[in-house]
């Protein structure tokens, strides 16, 4: 698969600032060894950004490197550069770095866009405030506190001095800018142009004075990147030295830019993880704004008689929990001590002992006056009527009680009371009929993938509803593969079909062809069902008449396989849950199971496979040869845990429940285009199962880069549910 790249201009088209888009980057650090400088934390990142500076005299430096970390290290050291490095651009596709003596604030610089480029600017050159004594300040203020113009550092007029740029390398004694080369008290200063005043400090504010927040800082999006004790913050897109769940791509609305202080979890004020291995996190010193101007989109709608969403805007006077126990006053520490006080949560209306939701919990709550019951929810407060556009669900949505009544494909839901017989057919308990109101989307069978409903369309008996998880409610990360909880194999016996033991051949392997050309692989999991990847059928309303499933073949070019092959049309396509990258294909007629065509077993729902288990992938995809022979090939991989997988991906990957990681035993082996949809087959207790599905990843069989597969065990219940209910 080829990836497009944009070439940098040979001479003087440079790059910078369009918008912030964090991508994970790994910073090397070894505990127990001398701590290495986390230089990437000293740069502000602007993704897909370029700059243009049309000046033939400007020099730049370029070199092939392995990562943005290397670029940052070279820029900070400034070794071998004929200029002071203020910024760099990293070309992700070509692994090349471009170092610049200018940044986005320099004169004559124009902004641009470059898909493959990320710009990093040294924060010291773009800050308009100082941290601590201001020893790192490299801004352009050149006037003293009393308004006197500064004397250039390389000049001896009107004042002779020893602070020459050549004597203080690295202190950026450029032009006549205010500096603090010795890190003295008082902050940046300069010699003045007034013969009567030798030197004077400059009026540059502390960053803690410039930055301000409203309420408890949940909407703060400023560039404060140090804690109140002066520790540098860890980047949100990194897991070193502290592992955490607040990944920018998982919480796109939390403002996780670079390593800036944020408050994503309802703490009293903004905070950050630190670069100190012994200090996981600390609060940041950000003052309250004098005028509490709050972005209206960040303020929950206030209600007094009912709650909207999670009830963060509830301002009513209910003061007991659901069972009638009175609430404890928020300004009291008896009988329960706590830090959720009116002082710490100024904008949360913590008056008296009224039920509130100051920390983003499921609903309004309070500490109770019962010493044996610390907190309780005020679930007796009714929910306000909400439109479907505001709907969301928590967990798997089994408690969702909204009024949406359409599927994700736009079909109108049918009444639950007309479908109770079908519902009883695939669940083994009596559903709560009180929740199955009218034709609203619900989750009576505890489906792991959210609310759904029956439809009046016989070809689509049921489907999921277009409801998202509530903000902050995300798919948890995968369990540790070193400690499997559920065995994936359902039996220790080999499967037998029609009295014939399943062959050691790969009879379950399917070649999906479009107009007689192989496009994807697939797995025959039932006589009438094939499991494959969604990417093989990108258009939801695609005409299936041009698609065929070829079974029982080894040579995708059909040579010498007339007797064993079965060619079946596809009658139906069922898309998997949102984000699953899976589809199930219903065959026009069942496959005939014989010595050349067989089914592959599915794993138990939610099971895990031990790390280092050897598995295999199969496919007819790209092999690196111009004239591929079209033969089915196999590559052996081993299951890899989350931590090790993340290391191989330079910290850019954190597996969740729906993903599985496997690395090649042979360098350069792995799935490529044409293999997508094919299976990752593992064996447990002498039973082979399809544990993963190949989907497009981060390149094709890249050395030391394990593949990320769809974890079939996470979707096993959905697969069984579809097979059971899609009868036509």
From Swiss-Prot:
Domain Kringle span(s) in chain numbering: 129-207, 212-289, 306-384, 392-470
Ranges where the PAN domain occurs: 38-124
Disulfide bonds: 71-97, 75-85, 129-207, 150-190, 178-202, 212-289, 233-272, 261-284, 306-384, 327-366, 355-378, 392-470, 413-453, 441-465, 488-607, 520-536, 615-682, 645-661, 672-700
Keywords per UniProt: Disulfide bond, Glycoprotein, Growth factor, Kringle, Pyrrolidone carboxylic acid, Repeat, Serine protease homolog, Signal
CDD domains documented for this protein: KR (cd00108), PAN_APPLE (cd00129), Tryp_SPc (cd00190)
Signal peptide: 1-32
Modified residues (Pyrrolidone carboxylic acid): 33
Keyword Transport found: no
Pfam families with a match to the protein in the record: Kringle, PAN_1, Trypsin
Similarity comment: family membership: Belongs to the peptidase S1 family. Plasminogen subfamily.
Quaternary structure and partners: Dimer of an alpha chain and a beta chain linked by a disulfide bond. Interacts with SRPX2; the interaction increases HGF mitogenic activity.
Name of the protein described by the UniProt record: Hepatocyte growth factor
Organism: Rattus norvegicus
Lineage of the organism: Eukaryota, Metazoa, Chordata, Craniata, Vertebrata
């Amino acid at each position: 698969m080829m990836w497009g790249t944009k070439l940098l201009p040979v001479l003087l088209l440079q790059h910078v600032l369009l918008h912030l888009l964090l991508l994970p980057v790994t910073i090397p650090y070894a505990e127990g060894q001398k701590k290495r400088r986390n230089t990437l934390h000293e740069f502000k990142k602007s993704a897909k950004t370029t700059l243009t500076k049309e000046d033939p005299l400007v020099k730049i430096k370029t070199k092939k490197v392995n990562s943005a970390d290397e670029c940052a290290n070279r820029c900070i050291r400034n070794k071998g550069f004929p200029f002071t490095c203020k910024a760099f651009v990293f070309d992700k596709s070509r692994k090349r770095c471009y170092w610049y003596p200018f940044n986005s604030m320099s004169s004559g610089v124009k902004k641009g866009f470059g898909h493959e480029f990320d710009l990093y600017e040294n924060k010291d050159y773009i800050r308009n405030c100082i941290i601590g004594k201001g020893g790192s300040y490299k801004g352009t203020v050149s006037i003293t506190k009393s308004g006197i113009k500064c004397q250039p550092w390389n000049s001896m007029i009107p004042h002779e001095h020893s602070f020459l740029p050549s004597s203080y390398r690295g202190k950026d004694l450029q032009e006549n800018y205010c500096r603090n080369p010795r890190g003295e008290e008082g902050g940046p200063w300069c010699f003045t142009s007034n013969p009567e005043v030798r030197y004077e400090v400059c009026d540059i504010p502390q960053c803690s004075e410039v930055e301000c927040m409203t309420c408890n800082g949940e909407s703060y999006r400023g560039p404060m990147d140090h804690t109140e004790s002066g520790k540098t913050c860890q980047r949100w897109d990194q897991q070193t030295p502290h592992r955490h769940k607040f990944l920018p791509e998982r919480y796109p609305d939390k403002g996780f830019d670079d390593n800036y202080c944020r408050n994503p979890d309802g703490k009293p004020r903004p905070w950050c993880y630190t670069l100190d291995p012994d200090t996981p996190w600390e609060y940041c010193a950000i003052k309250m704004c004098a005028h509490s101007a709050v972005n209206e989109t960040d303020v929950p709608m206030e209600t007094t008689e009912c709650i909207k969403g999670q009830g963060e805007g509830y301002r009513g006077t209910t003061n007991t929990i659901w069972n009638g126990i009175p609430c404890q006053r928020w300004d009291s520490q008896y009988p329960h001590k706590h830090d959720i006080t009116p002082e710490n949560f100024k904008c949360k209306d913590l008056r008296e002992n009224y039920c509130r939701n100051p920390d983003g919990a499921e609903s309004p709550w309070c500490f109770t006056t019962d010493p044996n019951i610390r907190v309780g929810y005020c679930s007796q407060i009714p929910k306000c009527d909400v439109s479907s556009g505001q709907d969301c669900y928590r967990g798997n949505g089994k408690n969702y009680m909204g009024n949406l009544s359409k599927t994700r494909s736009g079909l109108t839901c049918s009444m639950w009371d007309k479908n109770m017989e079908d519902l009883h057919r695939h669940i083994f308990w009596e559903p709560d009929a009180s929740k199955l109101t009218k034709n609203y989307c619900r989750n009576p069978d505890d489906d792991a993938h959210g609310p759904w409903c029956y439809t009046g369309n016989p070809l689509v008996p049921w489907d999921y509803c277009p409801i998202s998880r509530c903000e902050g409610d995300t798919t948890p990360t995968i369990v540790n593969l070193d400690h499997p909880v559920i065995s994936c194999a359902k039996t220790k016996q080999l499967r037998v079909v029609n009295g014939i033991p399943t062959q050691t051949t790969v009879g379950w392997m399917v070649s999906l062809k479009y107009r007689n050309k192989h496009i994807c692989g697939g797995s025959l999991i039932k006589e009438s069902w094939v499991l494959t990847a969604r990417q093989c059928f990108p258009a939801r309303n695609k005409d299936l008449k041009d698609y065929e499933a070829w079974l029982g073949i080894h040579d995708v070019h059909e040579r010498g396989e007339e007797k064993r092959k079965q060619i079946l049309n596809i009658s139906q396509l069922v898309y998997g849950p949102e984000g699953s990258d899976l589809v199930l294909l219903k065959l026009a007629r069942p496959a005939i199971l014989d010595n050349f065509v067989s089914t592959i077993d599915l794993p138990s729902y939610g099971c895990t496979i031990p790390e280092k288990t050897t598995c295999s992938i199969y496919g007819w995809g790209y092999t690196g040869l111009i004239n591929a022979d079209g033969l089915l090939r196999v590559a052996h991989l081993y299951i890899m845990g989350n931590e090790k997988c993340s290391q191989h991906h330079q910290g850019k990957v954190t597996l969740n429940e729906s993903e599985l990681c496997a690395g090649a035993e042979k360098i350069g082996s792995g799935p490529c285009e044409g293999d997508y949809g094919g299976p990752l087959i593992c064996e447990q207790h002498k039973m082979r199962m399809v544990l993963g599905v190949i989907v497009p990843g981060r390149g094709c069989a890249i050395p030391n880069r394990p593949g990320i597969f769809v974890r079939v065990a996470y979707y096993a219940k959905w697969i069984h549910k579809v097979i059971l209910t899609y009868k036509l």
